[in-house]
Amino acid sequence: MSIGKTPPRGETKYWTNGKYPWVSISDMSDYGLVTTTKESVSENAKSLFGEISPAGTLIMSFKLTVGITSLLNTSAYHNEAIISIYPFVDKNYQARNFLFHILPIISNLGDTKDAIKGKTLNSKSLNNLLLPLPPLNEQRRIVAMIELLFDKLK
């Protein structure tokens, strides 16, 4: 897991000639795919961020609007209200897809704190979330059932 960062807004060197997508919660949608972002950061911002989150990464909001999950359609950086989750334990992304659906439920059961603008999970409460992790075959079955139900809602 890795928590994002926001470059200083007053320093234009990070925001001018943006080359890399920068995700904020407003770019995410419940159970969605982040394909575009409202903002991007420059080459100068790379030194602040470290590794970019690759396409396919599961991201989740944990501040203000706790538990929104999305998948990155492209490599991107993100702000400090979002966490990248790397459950790449299998080539078919079964664990990632399972967490994509289960984390919105589990994260809202966590020890959230009231902040000025809404609920938030801190690093300790994120680490203390108890996640049910059935075997990969069972995760695949659960995800298939959830996606079938979502398809019926469309």
Identify the role of each PLM range.
Residues 1-12, 26-55:
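Sequence-specific dsDNA recognition surfaces
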Residues 1-6, 30, 128, 132-154:
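Non-catalytic DNA-recognition/assembly elements of restriction-modification systems
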Residues 9-11, 70-72, 114-116:
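Short beta-alpha junctions and helix-cap segments that line functional grooves
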Residues 23:
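ATP-grasp fold ATP-binding core
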Residues 60-61:
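A generic structural signal for residues embedded in beta-strands
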Residues 64-68:
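Short, charged beta-turn/beta-strand-edge "cap" motif at the junction between a beta-strand
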Residues 76-84, 116-133:
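A short glycine-rich beta-alpha junction/loop motif
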Residues 89-95, 132-134:
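Catalytic cores of nucleotide-enabled group-transfer and carboxylate-activating enzymes in metabolic
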